[in-house]
Structures are given as structure tokens and as C-alpha cells.
């Protein structure tokens, strides 16, 4: 994540453009979703860094200070019967939490740990090392994130790069994504990460991670975890010879070129499935939660929800696979949370829990940490549900019927494309920007989709769609009227 000084380098260049398209809507102002803060007792410092629902009305939360707390009656509304009990303590900055059978698994700085309560008194009495050995130097920025489970029962972890060159020991796997079998066997999978805070699977079971704007990363991104992939940060390649990995180090880094050009020049380099344009869609990205609630969280089934730290918000991502590559659109979704969101977890009732802390970096909000629950009210909203690429444009699906007159007018669609520079400096402005002409707009018979034809689509570029001129059949404006589609592959005709 960025320091305040580093973030300030880009503020003046992006704020004006962001204000044109960003429609920041506080959580309490969104009638389709209600945010319920869970009051935390004064003796509990709930700086949430791991979060999972565990059934029977309870949620478990790991904290930066090395504790695991059980929140009882977590679904009580209003939350008057909440009770907090400490399950575990003494951990080294756990940054994730999952439950498997009757045990919790957390990733500490130095190891993946299994925690159990063998005598069933409500407190952990067994701490077992499952896997370790990825290397830690003591640098503050060497966070270890996870675990998250894949469908095969493997644990996935991601490892931060140290903040300065003095922190880079020759025998550490900093900047790597690793898979750990249930028996503790470590397999290094991919490299090139910077600050890979979020992990999660999509509806098809493929694993993804989020990374932060910084050196070699022009802005924040959502990346598909793939065997042998290199995501851009070269300092991770120090470990290439230490492990039996498929990652092939590029002979020369094409610094100064656009990321689209780098993807063509370096076979192992992988673009993100989605870029989150800086400031327009937050300043940082954290956890990943795939909506498999069966509609209990609204009209976005199978989509990803992604936490935002600095702006204390949640974003939404709609993915598709085109010519073997993931790509898709991101949207602002819900803001106004009480602190920076680090972890997300689905509740047993289909609600979404957000675990929060502003530790280390400033975030918007009224508190330093906390836990909130987001519930769909059932009220219809007018929003872009998905954007799908076509060989000559885009197919845009909405959550409610369109006003045909506004949606059939091609001048009501404003599009541009841009990309980022691959370099060792901190972040990148939007570069090589082009305005795109919409040559035709058509509305489907059921009025739920608009098909637009666009001149000048470009692979490897973000395509920004400003749709704020559209109206619903009832005359309503769009809830967040901009979509940001990362076009890695143009579909075949």
C-alpha cells in the first residue's frame, strides 16, 4: 500500500478526472443495502485481519495484535445480544483465517498454523505448525497473507515484498504466491507480486489475488493465480533458483513501455484480469469474496466483491473468460464504512461481513477498527450488472429495464481507453488515452441489455464506459454510472 507522500504524487493528476465519473454514495444512502455496525467492547481491540463465519450464529475474527475472537449472535439485528470471547492469542500478525472441520488455520509471519480447542472449553490449547520456511528478515513490510482454500483443499498464501533493498535476503520467497497441501507440502506457484493483500476464488474455483499500486504496478489490480506466472515485480525473482518453479525470469525488463507492450514482449508476464483505475475505483484493494449466496445478496450472483482500504468501501467485479484469459469490469459498489476494509466474509444468511482497521495507513471513516455486516434489503436498484466484450464493442446488462429512448441514443455513451507504464517508479498515470467513437447503440427486446458498437478497441487497455446519461424505465439514474473494463483479449467475431 502507498505512503501518504507517495499517494500524493498522483492525486492532482487524477482527482479531477475521477470527480467527473465517481458518484461516491455513502452506505447509509444506498436503499438496496443496509450496513449494520457491530458494537465492539472497549477491552477488545478488533483490528480485523482475518474473518470467517463458523455457523451457529457466530463469526471468528483474527486481529493484527495476534488474537482470534469469536463473535456470538453476530446476526442479531439490532445487535444487542453480541458477545465476544477470546479463542486464541500470542500469534504473530495473522493476516487470514479459515476453518476446516474443528480447527482454525491462520498465516503468521513465519508459518501456517493450525489451532484447535481439544478440551472444548472455548479456548485454543493446541498450536501446530503446518508449513514454514518462506523466509522473514524482520522488515515491517514482509506481510504473509492467507490462507484461502481451493476446491482441492489446498491452502493458498501470498507473500509481500520488503519495503527496501536492505530487506531483501537471498533466501526468501518474497513476492511469491504459494500453495500448501493439507499435509503441509509447499509448492511455489507464481512470482512478481508486490503487496498481495487479498485472496479468493471465483465461482468456477479459479484462484485470484489483489495487488497494490506502487513500483512496477501502475495501479491496483485483480490477478488470476497461474502456474509459472510473473506479475511484474522483479525483486521476487531472487528466489527463482531456490525452488522448483515454472517461473521463467525475463532476460531484460522492458522498463518504460506500457504494460500492454510488456505483455507482448515477456512471455511469462501476466496482466491483471482487472485494473482498478486509481482514485476512480479507490486507492487500495484488499480481500476477495465471491457471491455464491443464490441471490440472497441481490442481483450480482457469481460476481466478486473486493474490499477497499483507504476509501473504506467495497467494489464489485464482473469477470468473463475470452480466448483463455480472464478479463472484465469493475464498479464502485458501496462506501461509507467506519474504517478501512481488510477482510470480507459471507455470513450464513447471505449477508457480507466487513472486517476493518486503519492500522499503518490512513483510511476514511469514524473509527480505527471494527466489524460491520451488509444486508440486501430486497429493494430494486438500477445498476450495470455486467459488461461483456464483443469483437466490435460491448454488451451491457442492467439490473432493471432501460428507458429505450435514452439507451438507444449512441451519444449517451462516452468511452475512452488508456493503459499504464511499466517502470520502477511509484505507480503510473493513465497513458496513451484515446476517446472512442460509439457508432451504434441497440436495446434488447426485454430492455435489460444494450449493445454498443465501438471503433478502436485495444487489447491490454482499460476501456472506461461513462453511462450516466442512461435512465431506467422508471426514470431513475444509474447507481454508479461508470464501468471500467480491462480488455486483455478482443473476442473473435
What are the functions of these language-model segments?
Residues 443-446:
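Blade-terminus and WD-like Trp-Asp/Gly-His loop motifs, strongest in beta-propeller folds
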Residues 395-401, 453:
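Short edge beta-strand/loop segments characteristic of extracellular beta-sandwich folds
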Residues 27-381, 386, 390-393, 404:
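Beta-propeller domains with acidic blade repeats across secreted/periplasmic ectodomains
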Residues 399-440, 465-472, 481-484:
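Short, surface-exposed alpha-helix to beta-strand junction/turn motifs within ectodomains of secreted
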Residues 11-23:
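Bacterial N-terminal signal peptides
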Residues 479-493:
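Short beta-strand elements
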Residues 456-460:
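Surface-exposed, short loops/turns at beta-strand junctions within beta-sandwich domains
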Residues 2-14:
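Bacterial N-terminal signal peptides that target proteins for export
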Amino acid at each position: 500500500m502507498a505512503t501518504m507522500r507517495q499517494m500524493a504524487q498522483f492525486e492532482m493528476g487524477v482527482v479531477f478526472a475521477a470527480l467527473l465519473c465517481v458518484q461516491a454514495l455513502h452506505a447509509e444512502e444506498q436503499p438496496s443495502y443496509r450496513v449494520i455496525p457491530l458494537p465492539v467492547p472497549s477491552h477488545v481491540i478488533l483490528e480485523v485481519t482475518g474473518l470467517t463465519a463458523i455457523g451457529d450464529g457466530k463469526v471468528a475474527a483474527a486481529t493484527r495484535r495476534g488474537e482470534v475472537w469469536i463473535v456470538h449472535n453476530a446476526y442479531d439485528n439490532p445487535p444487542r445480544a453480541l458477545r465476544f470471547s477470546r479463542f486464541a492469542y500470542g500469534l504473530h500478525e495473522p493476516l487470514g483465517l479459515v476453518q476446516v472441520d474443528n480447527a482454525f488455520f491462520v498465516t503468521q509471519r513465519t508459518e501456517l498454523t493450525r489451532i484447535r480447542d481439544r478440551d472444548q472449553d472455548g479456548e485454543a490449547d493446541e498450536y501446530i505448525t503446518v508449513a514454514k520456511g518462506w523466509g522473514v528478515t524482520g522488515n515491517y513490510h514482509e506481510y504473509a497473507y492467507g490462507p484461502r482454500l481451493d476446491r482441492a483443499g489446498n491452502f493458498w498464501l501470498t507473500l509481500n515484498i520488503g519495503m527496501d533493498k536492505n530487506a531483501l535476503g537471498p533466501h526468501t520467497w518474497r513476492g511469491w504466491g504459494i500453495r500448501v497441501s493439507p499435509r503441509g507440502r509447499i509448492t511455489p506457484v507464481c512470482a512478481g507480486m508486490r503487496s498481495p493483500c487479498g485472496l479468493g476464488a471465483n465461482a468456477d474455483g479459479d484462484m485470484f489475488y489483489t495487488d497494490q499500486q506502487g513500483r512496477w504496478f501502475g495501479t491496483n489490480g485483480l490477478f488470476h493465480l497461474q502456474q509459472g506466472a510473473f506479475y511484474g515485480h522483479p525483486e521476487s525473482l531472487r528466489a527463482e533458483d531456490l525452488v522448483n518453479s515454472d517461473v521463467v525470469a525475463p532476460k531484460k525488463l522492458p522498463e518504460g513501455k506500457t504494460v500492454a507492450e510488456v505483455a507482448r514482449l515477456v512471455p511469462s508476464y501476466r496482466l491483471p484480469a482487472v485494473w482498478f483505475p486509481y482514485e476512480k475505483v479507490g486507492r487500495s484493494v484488499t480481500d476477495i469474496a465471491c457471491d455464491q449466496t443464490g441471490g440472497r445478496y441481490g442481483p450480482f450472483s457469481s460476481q466478486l466483491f473486493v474490499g477497499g482500504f483507504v476509501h473504506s468501501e467495497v467494489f464489485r467485479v464482473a469477470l468473463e473468460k475470452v480466448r483463455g484469459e480472464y478479463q472484465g469490469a469493475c464498479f464502485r459498489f458501496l462506501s461509507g464504512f467506519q474504517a478501512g476494509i481488510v477482510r470480507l466474509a459471507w455470513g450464513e444468511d447471505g449477508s457480507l461481513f466487513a472486517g476493518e482497521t486503519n492500522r499503518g495507513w490512513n483510511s476514511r471513516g469514524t473509527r480505527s477498527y471494527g466489524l460491520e455486516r451488509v444486508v440486501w434489503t430486497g429493494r430494486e436498484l438500477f445498476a450495470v450488472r455486467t459488461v461483456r466484450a464483443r469483437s466490435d464493442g460491448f454488451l451491457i446488462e442492467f439490473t432493471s429495464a432501460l428507458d429505450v429512448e435514452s439507451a438507444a441514443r449512441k451519444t449517451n455513451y462516452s468511452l475512452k481507453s488508456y493503459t499504464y507504464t511499466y517502470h520502477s517508479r511509484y505507480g503510473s498515470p493513465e497513458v496513451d488515452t484515446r476517446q472512442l467513437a460509439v457508432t451504434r447503440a441497440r436495446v434488447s427486446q426485454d430492455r435489460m441489455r444494450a449493445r454498443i458498437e465501438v471503433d478502436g478497441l485495444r487489447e491490454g487497455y482499460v476501456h472506461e464506459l461513462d453511462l450516466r446519461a442512461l435512465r431506467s424505465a422508471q426514470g431513475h439514474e444509474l447507481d454508479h454510472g461508470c464501468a471500467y473494463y480491462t480488455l486483455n483479449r478482443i473476442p473473435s467475431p
